[in-house]
Swiss-Prot record:
Gene3D superfamilies to which the protein is assigned, alphabetical: Ribulose bisphosphate carboxylase, large subunit, C-terminal domain, RuBisCO large subunit, N-terminal domain
Site features described as Transition state stabilizer, chain residue numbers: 327
Active site positions: 168 (proton acceptor), 287 (proton acceptor)
One MF term in the entry's GO annotations: monooxygenase activity
InterPro entries: RuBisCO, RuBisCo_large_chain_AS, RuBisCO_lsu_C, RuBisCO_lsu_C_sf, RuBisCO_lsu_fd_N, RuBisCO_lsu_N_sf, RuBisCO_lsuI
Gene name tied to this protein: cbbL
Keyword terms, alphabetized: Calvin cycle, Carbon dioxide fixation, Lyase, Magnesium, Metal-binding, Monooxygenase, Oxidoreductase
Family: Belongs to the RuBisCO large chain family. Type I subfamily.
The name this protein goes by in its record: Ribulose bisphosphate carboxylase large chain
PROSITE patterns listed in its UniProt record: RUBISCO_LARGE
Co-factor requirement: Mg(2+)
Domain of life: Bacteria
Length: 473
């Protein structure tokens, strides 16, 4: 066996980390980066630099390389592809041995894949487009506390999307008035109401008061309707200790579901909370506040499909996923891709939807995608078509903005939803025939009729900033 010797100095990254002959192992974590190199840096060197800086490399040769099996532990840039329609950047595919990462730690995965490498001078911009987590790593993660089927059983709701609403105005209401709004929405026909992402424990409404008034509203609406109801109580807090204190109180008063802002709250806190929810029989709703800071720039950051995968591993029963038709960013095909990534047990590579790798989730439960943001009754046919039954459709302004009040807004949405589901089940192409379906339903629902008149001119027709790259042929 040849004896390794140390040779000091700086050498090109490609000499160690560019390996086009490498065939990825089933146990490797695979990443696709979109790299925009600095002028004068060729593709192979840029790809190798990213592989090095996100795994074992540093800027110079170090003698301690001789104390480990560098060839085993290093990341390997094994393929490069053009980005269709954009010659300023390219895709680089990198394989990482599974032993580089702590088991069950999305924190550790992100620290490597999107850590210091994103400030590396050799690249002008860098975006993590997709990650393949091998089943060997998936099995080390807790995943959703309960998942879609368990939630349906807990809430006793089957055969349709779940219906929700974000209480508005999101800030400024007293706890008592907040609880009143919750009650009216639930009594009117919604399954859930929710805190908005920035409702924590402010001077105008402390968390414990909110929890108490909301629980009173839930219990009253359940008695009157005979249906299970819930409200996503946001337990996001300044410290993990305070977060768990709020979660424990929610459990104590009988709340079925709590909520966490998983990006601003942090992945460590989220994984811990998901584990707590699993142990304590609580459902967990996840808000994605701050995601667009990371995912909206098409050349730099982290694609939302990666944030979706990370959340499924970290744990959550719901995740906001965009609407396609509402006020928030979201290309239709890309959205369909990450919705499947949230719910399905196996997802095939499909470049037309931005999916770069097969992803096997094994027996890990799925996550409810949550459509929320600028939607109203006219969007219902498209939402039911796009998201299917295993989803949560949340109408904030589209409920509380009803001219007759919250209960009427909730009733309008419930009637619209059930009309669309019934028509779909009869074979009607509801996205195409939606106007007819809703108009017919409105004949027996004055609340729906008024809602349709109120929002008939409201559209959000802005071009998508982060478009899918043209599919490879």
């Amino acid at each position: 066996m040849a004896v390794k010797t140390y040779s000091a100095g700086v050498k090109e990254y490609r000499q160690t980390y560019w390996m086009p002959e490498y065939t990825p192992l089933d146990t490797d974590i695979l990443a696709c980066f979109k790299i925009t190199p600095q002028a004068g840096v060729d593709r192979e060197e840029a790809a190798a630099a990213v592989a090095a800086e996100s795994s074992t490399g540093t800027w110079t040769t170090v003698w301690t390389d001789l104390l480990t099996d560098l060839d085993y532990y290093k990341g390997r840039a094994y393929a490069i592809e053009d980005v269709p329609g954009d010659d300023t950047c390219f895709y680089a595919f990198i394989a990482y041995p599974i032993d580089l990462f702590e088991e069950g730690s999305v924190v550790n995965v992100f620290t490597s894949l999107v850590g210091n490498v994103f400030g590396f001078k050799a690249v002008r911009a860098l975006r993590l487009e997709d990650v393949r987590f091998p089943i060997a790593y998936v099995k080390t993660c807790g995943g959703p506390p309960h998942g879609i089927q368990v939630e349906r059983d807990v809430m006793n709701k089957y055969g349709r999307p779940l219906l929700g609403c974000t209480i508005k105005p999101k800030l400024g209401l007293s706890a008592k008035n907040y609880g009143r709004a919750v009650y009216e929405c639930l009594r009117g026909g919604l399954d859930f109401t929710k805190d908005d992402e920035n409702v924590n424990s402010q001077p105008f409404m402390r968390w414990r008061q909110r929890f108490d008034f909301v629980m009173e509203a839930i219990q009253k609406s359940e008695r009157e309707t005979g249906e299970r109801k819930g409200h996503y109580l946001n337990v996001t807090a300044p410290t993990p200790e305070e977060m768990y204190k709020r979660a424990e109180y929610a459990k104590e008063i009988g709340a079925p579901i709590i909520m966490h802002d998983y990006i601003t709250g942090g992945f460590c806190a989220n994984t811990g909370l998901a584990n707590w929810c699993r142990d304590n029989g609580m459902l967990l709703h996840i808000h994605r506040a701050m995601h667009a800071v990371l995912d909206r720039n098409p050349h730099h950051g982290i694609h939302f499909r990666v944030l979706t995968k990370i959340l499924r591993l970290s744990g959550g029963d719901h995740l906001h996923s965009g609407t396609v038709v509402g006020k928030l960013e979201g290309d239709r095909e890309a959205t369909l891709g990450w919705i499947d990534m949230m719910r399905d047990s196996f997802v095939k590579e499909d470049r037309s939807r931005g999916i770069f790798f097969d992803q096997d989730w094994g027996s890990m439960p799925g996550v409810f995608p949550v459509a929320s943001g600028g939607i109203h009754v006219w969007h219902m046919p498209a939402l039911v078509t796009i998201f299917g039954d295993d989803s949560v459709l949340q109408f904030g302004g589209g409920t509380l903005g009803h001219p007759w009040g919250n209960a009427a807004g909730a009733a309008a949405n419930r009637v619209a939803l059930e009309a669309c589901v019934e028509a779909r089940n009869k074979g009607v192409a509801i996205e195409k025939e939606g106007k007819t379906v809703l108009t017919e339903a409105a004949k027996n629902s004055p609340e729906l009729k008024i809602a349709m008149e109120t929002w008939k001119e409201i559209k959000f027709e802005f071009d998508t900033v982060d478009k899918l790259d043209v599919a490879h042929k």
